Structures are given as C-alpha cells and as structure tokens.
Amino acid sequence: MKIIGISDSHGSHWDIKVPDGDILVHAGDFSSQGRLPDTLDFLRWFNTHPHKHKIFIAGNHDWLMEQDPNFWRIIKMEFPNLTYLQDEACEVEGLKFYGSPQSPRFFNWAFNRDRGADIKRYWDKIPTDTDVLI
C-alpha cells in the first residue's frame, strides 16, 4: 500500500503534482485564510484525485473548519469520497489513522491550544494503536 502525504498547500494545491498511490493524505493548511471559497476550491481539487482513499485534516490557517464545527456535515454530503478527521480516527484497509488539527499556540491561528493541560486533553485522545497520525 502506498500512502501519499502532502500539506501546507495554502491555496496553491492546483500547482502540486500528486504522485499515484492508494491513500492521499493532506495534513492541513490547505488554505491561506480559511475562507469558504478557498475551502470549497480545495475540496473540489482534492476530490479529483484517483486515490482510492482521501483523508485530510485542517491546519492552523483553515479557520472555517474551526469557526463552523458543523461544516464537516457539508463535506460528507457533497464530497462522500473524502474523509475529514478532527480529533477522531478512521480505519482504511487495516490501517488506523488518527487526525487532529490541534497545535501549540502560535500567535492567534485556528486550532491553537495552550501548551500543557489544554493541548494535552486533545492529544490524550490519540489511540495507542494508531498506525498513521496526522
């Protein structure tokens, strides 16, 4: 099985030459400012790839995903071939993936948490049997 990992495309995803593989993973920062048009453009692009499975998380630039915590429902309805993980797991062909957008505070970006107990409560949820952590 071949897993292709990309991240930090910041709205320039159309310029990326994505290699063939079985699973395509985008590890966040697919937009620069997390606006709805940018997010939808990324989702359309991500959905065009032939990889059997496509998994992604938000990054600290992907504000929409934090500001509208129910936006994932739209993703699931409009893009059923995409898997969005926000502090949750999925299993793909026997591999256990866990995705979390939470990151240590850096200025005032999306999904920033204070170091220590605040961020630890998210990271403590990561299952010990996770094969791929995003």
Labelled PLM ranges:
Residues 1-3:
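Extreme N-terminal starter segment of soluble prokaryotic enzymes
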Residues 6-92:
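Core catalytic region of metal-dependent phosphoesterases/phosphodiesterases
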Residues 21-23, 56, 68, 80, ...:
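Active-site-proximal loop/helix segment associated with metal-binding centers of metalloenzymes
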